[in-house]
């Protein structure tokens, strides 16, 4: 009897990707986040599709259409809450996924890593344009502040900002095009995710030890499908707890007020998952300098493979690098906290010190630790 799973042209691709895929036998729960991100993306596309059926991208009716979804549409409140909190879950998984890649040296698969960084940037763009759509106060002012940063680019900046706005300020044209962007970008993310997987399956997965695992591999199904299912249960549990019991805890109260160009909120800030980058942007008193630091804070991920100096791939057996990694984690949490605080002392100086430490850790301290660990491992007799 012919096994259709192994012979059918389409089923064969699925089989080689998710069923008979040879996987290292020792990968831990930190390897769950790839599949969780895939599920998050599907949840976001489905809930977003149903929201788009009832949403209107017009400045006069956008805010009331969101209220209409929550009040009048069958289970509209649930779809809305799942979509809003699903974005938070998405970025939580994303940060853990990137963190795991840095800790275990997965960035040495350069193609997979670079596509991953492009994915991260695309997802950040998607989340930003999506946050503008409800047309609340923070949506409007967030869009104004962030798009206004383009005007810091010398010579073409103002023209570029007005081109993005479709006018001389954030208005109806901006909202309409942001809705179009928010609809198309998740499908671009999906295509990039497939390319990400394609490159990953060229090399096979990394593992906690960082040693070539070819001698000890097991099929993905049933071992890791079961393991991923456990992660999924936790993901759904946390998402449902958020969406049903505390749906607005991660949002901003200002977004319950319709957008008003004549009234600026006291503290303009983005969603929590952008606060670390926002803190780095604000820590530099110069507009262009801030924009460059903001870009550098994300694009620095692209040069991490070039900064790998250690003889060992993973940080599992490198205690000094481990310490620096957890300092970097604490530093990012500090930046996230600072990004949500008003621009006053002592928050300004804390933000500036944390921003300096962020770049110092990645560019200087971690590569130096790798070299020092190499020296310590050399026989001294």
From Swiss-Prot:
Heme b b566 binds at residues 97, 196. SUPFAM superfamilies: a domain/subunit of cytochrome bc1 complex (Ubiquinol-cytochrome c reductase), Transmembrane di-heme cytochromes. Binds 2 heme b groups non-covalently. Heme b b562 binds at residues 83, 182. It is a multi-pass membrane protein. The keyword Mitochondrion applies. A ubiquinone binds at residue 201. It comes from the Eukaryota. Its cofactor is heme b. Component of the ubiquinol-cytochrome c reductase complex (complex III or cytochrome b-c1 complex) that is part of the mitochondrial respiratory chain. The b-c1 complex mediates electron transfer from ubiquinol to cytochrome c. Contributes to the generation of a proton gradient across the mitochondrial membrane that is then used for ATP synthesis. Belongs to the cytochrome b family. The cytochrome bc1 complex contains 11 subunits: 3 respiratory subunits (MT-CYB, CYC1 and UQCRFS1), 2 core proteins (UQCRC1 and UQCRC2) and 6 low-molecular weight proteins (UQCRH/QCR6, UQCRB/QCR7, UQCRQ/QCR8, UQCR10/QCR9, UQCR11/QCR10 and a cleavage product of UQCRFS1). This cytochrome bc1 complex then forms a dimer. This is Cytochrome b. The lineage of its organism: Eukaryota, Metazoa, Chordata, Craniata, Vertebrata.
